[in-house]
Amino acid sequence: MKKYLLFNFKTNPSNVIQLKQLLKVFQGYSPKITEKFKVALFPPDIYLIESKKNLKAKFILGAQDVFWFNKIQATGEITPLMLNSLGVQYIIIGHSERRRYLEETDEMINWKIKACLNNKLTPVLCVGEQENDKSGLIPNFRTKQEIFEQLNYAFRGIKINPPAGGTNLMIVYEPVWAIGKGVSQDLKASQAIIALIRFWLSRRFGEAIAKHLPILYGGSVNHQNIKEFLSSKDINGVLIGSASTNKIELSKIFKQLTTNN
C-alpha cells in the first residue's frame, strides 16, 4: 500500500503568485512522487480553486477545516457540501493550532468528523500530547491519558465498518511540543505512541480496523528525517507543516524521496 504525504500549507503563501510558484515545485516532481506515494495538498480555503486549476497530476486536494453543518447560517465557515463541490477529498480535523488558538473543543472535533463521514469526505484527525514524554519506549500515564481522551471524544457515537481495502479516515500522531520547533519526536518513541493508538482502535473498533486504518506522523518533518519515518512499517505516512511552503526544503524532500540513495 502506498504511504501518505500530506502537505499542510497553514496560512501560506501570502498571495496567488507565490502559490503558483509553489505548485510548480510539486508539478516538477510529478509523476515520480505521485507514483510512489498518495500525495495530498491542504492550501488555505481561499486558494482551493487556484490549486485545483494548477495541479495536473494525481495530487489529492484537501482542506484545513470544515464546518459541521451544511444548512445553517454560520458567517465565515465552509460547509462539507462546498468542499465536495470543489473536489476536496481530505479534511484536517483537530489540529493543535486550532485547539489552542481558536479554542476548538473535543465536541466540535467530534461533530466535524461526523460531518466528514456523512458527506463522503475523509477526516484526518490530529492527536498528540502537549509536553515531551521523556520516559522512553513506554509512554507515561499522562501521555496515555491525554491521547486516549482525545480519541474517546473524537470518536464518540461513530461507527466504522470493517475495511474493504482501506478505511474512510486516518489519524495523525502529532506531538504538540514538536510542531514548528524544528525538533521531531524520536522514531522509536513515535512508534510506541502509534502502537498505543492502534491498541485503542482495536478495543474500540476491532482488530481489522486497527490494522488497516492509516496512522501518520507529524511534527517538524523535514528532508533530514522524512525517510526515517517513512521507513517504519508502523507509520503509514507523514503530515508535513512548515516545510510544505518552503520551496528549497520542499525540493530537498522530493529529491530524498525520488532518488535511490
Model-flagged regions — what are they?
Residues 1-161, 166-261:
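Active-site loop-to-helix "anion-binding N-cap" substructures in soluble metabolic enzymes
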